Amino acid sequence: MRTLRMLRQERGWTLDELARRTGLTKSYLSKVERGNSTPSIAVAIGLAEALGVDVTQLFGDAQDSANLEVRRVGTAADPTVPDSGSSFVHLAGGVVGKQMLPFLIYPPADEVECLYRAHSGDELILVRSGEIEMRFPDRTERLAAGDSVYFRGGIPHYVKSISPEPAEVLLVIAAPEEQA
């Protein structure tokens, strides 16, 4: 995410300042800037909010004038694999200033990376294939293909695959009002 460094420097911020504004460590932010670490979707949303930009600008696929984007089967970019273990494909990355942040995610099956995340904006998850387990602080839900869940992104949550085959999930996050 070399774009992160550019956006930070455009604001005249040091890594210390960005760390203060995001609650992330300076060393982690440095790793992200150098491309040695990839943030989760929740962390990327927090970075975008702190910088006052559309989250697509952090992934480097935003275009200035796209108001419509069609993605054909088989043309999706390779999934991004953040430090959280989930991999994801950012859908509609060329549209700037959108009110929804759509992703295809491929949740991990391991327990090691079970990190609860919270972020601004409401969230809709629809399981396209496989089965997942959605964990919240006070409950756990098992979802199969065709099942969905809607919740406030501010509720800490975690998703993991529980089926023998990898799960594919459509994730749509309502963009924070500042970005909408």
Identify the meaning behind each predicted range.
Residues 2-19:
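Short basic helix-loop element that most often maps to the first helix and adjoining turn
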Residues 25-37:
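Recognition helix of helix-turn-helix/homeodomain-like DNA-binding domains
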Residues 43-99:
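A short, N-terminal "cap"/entry segment at the start of jelly-roll beta-barrel domains
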Residues 77-116, 171-177:
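A short glycine-rich, His/Asp/Glu-containing loop-to-beta-strand
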Residues 86-87, 144-145, 153-179:
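Ligand-binding loop in jelly-roll beta-barrel domains
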Residues 106-107, 117-134:
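Short, conserved beta-strand element in jelly-roll/cupin
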Residues 111-114, 133, 140, 149, ...:
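Histidine-centered metal-chelating micro-motifs
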